[in-house]
Amino acid sequence: MKYAILIGDGMADYPIEKLGNRTILQAARTPAMDSIAARGRAGLAKTVPDSFPPGSDVANMSILGYDPATYYSGRAPLEAASMGVALAADDVAFRCNLITTEHGMIKDYSAGHISSDEAEILIDTLDYELSTENIRFYPGISYRHLIVAGNNLGAETECTPPHDITGEKIDKYLPRGKDGEFFSELIEASKVVLELHPVNLKRVEEGKNPANSIWVWGQGYAPKFTAFMKLYGKKGAVISAVDLLKGIGIYAGLDVIEVHGATGYLDTNYEGKVRAAIEALKTRDLVFVHVEAPDEAGHEGSIEKKLKAVEDFDSRIVAPILEYAENSDEPFTILVLPDHPTPISVKTHTRDPIPFAIYRTDKPETDNVEAFDEESVKNGSMGLVKASDLIGILIKS
């Protein structure tokens, strides 16, 4: 048996008036996901426990079978693993966003989805100007970067994700608590370095949002995972554009497969991800394919972009992998789901349960579900499940 887990990050949503009070999944054309739901078993999964923030880190750990109550230590350490940044026992890793500020507010949590090439120049400049014995900057992908603080600095600082406070006054949400003043001052110092940087002057000339500040959040120590093979007896691989998912894969002992042109946005290399997934399954039991674009569109509050992202995920990821599975000599089990909702109306993550469907190519089932969306799956036989149990269900199905 081969297994494919297909994640459309943030696909789930609330009913939208402009779509006739339908959700994005209800309004989008998604024949491949609908087929999986109609011929498999469906239900709702709780990916984020009530006591945890509704982040992609917590949600995707859960989906991969790692209970956050046991394994979660923060988002940034997972990203550090993907970036090849080793953490000492007293190192605290922080996500460092490049953001756009205007009139004392966070205008754009992604600095206009700045390119990785531009961002690397800015992060290298910040590291040159602001690094100390206890603070180092590391470039990542697009707006997503890393700060490593030594000597337990910032471990207890209270931080807010910037995508939760777009349009809000910065002063209300600066880091607070122990070491909060230090990191607030670091944010202010970054503005001096970035404001007149040639990269940003050019972006302004081109009508793009400048990356004129950093924002720190998501900190934590290096976690300790039990290997996926030891827990579930399967050899697997992770395919994603974002360091967070790659880091989870690394800590889980899964192979992380790089795909050229995978951007974490609408312009990602869908076909490259499919080719990589099919190739990975020739020598592995399981592949975990993650697409970030629906989440980014949700954060932007764009109905049009989210519809496109969901339809592209269905037609360019789910459909070809489903076709491959159904024509394979080996039986396949496919799990399709978002990790969490990123509703257009709130532009950030929520912890509402998400729809999922499981389909076995050698054992089609009728589950009284005809479409893949938040409402239809409520008629499924699976009911409401804890997401960290899904891998076990998948393997035993």
UniProtKB/Swiss-Prot annotation:
<keyword id="KW-0413">Isomerase</keyword>
<dbReference type="GO" id="GO:0006096">
    <property type="term" value="P:glycolytic process"/>
</dbReference>
<dbReference type="InterPro" id="IPR023665">
    <property type="entry name" value="ApgAM_prokaryotes"/>
</dbReference>
<comment type="similarity">
    <text>Belongs to the BPG-independent phosphoglycerate mutase family. A-PGAM subfamily.</text>
</comment>
<dbReference type="InterPro" id="IPR004456">
    <property type="entry name" value="Pglycerate_mutase_ApgM"/>
</dbReference>
<dbReference type="InterPro" id="IPR042253">
    <property type="entry name" value="Pglycerate_mutase_ApgM_sf"/>
</dbReference>
<dbReference type="Pfam" id="PF01676">
    <property type="entry name" value="Metalloenzyme"/>
</dbReference>
<dbReference type="GO" id="GO:0046872">
    <property type="term" value="F:metal ion binding"/>
</dbReference>
<keyword id="KW-0324">Glycolysis</keyword>
<protein>
    <recommendedName>
        <fullName>2,3-bisphosphoglycerate-independent phosphoglycerate mutase</fullName>
        <ecNumber>5.4.2.12</ecNumber>
    </recommendedName>
</protein>
<dbReference type="Pfam" id="PF10143">
    <property type="entry name" value="PhosphMutase"/>
</dbReference>
<dbReference type="InterPro" id="IPR006124">
    <property type="entry name" value="Metalloenzyme"/>
</dbReference>
<comment type="function">
    <text>Catalyzes the interconversion of 2-phosphoglycerate and 3-phosphoglycerate.</text>
</comment>
<dbReference type="GO" id="GO:0004619">
    <property type="term" value="F:phosphoglycerate mutase activity"/>
</dbReference>
<dbReference type="InterPro" id="IPR017850">
    <property type="entry name" value="Alkaline_phosphatase_core_sf"/>
</dbReference>
<comment type="pathway">
    <text>Carbohydrate degradation; glycolysis; pyruvate from D-glyceraldehyde 3-phosphate: step 3/5.</text>
</comment>
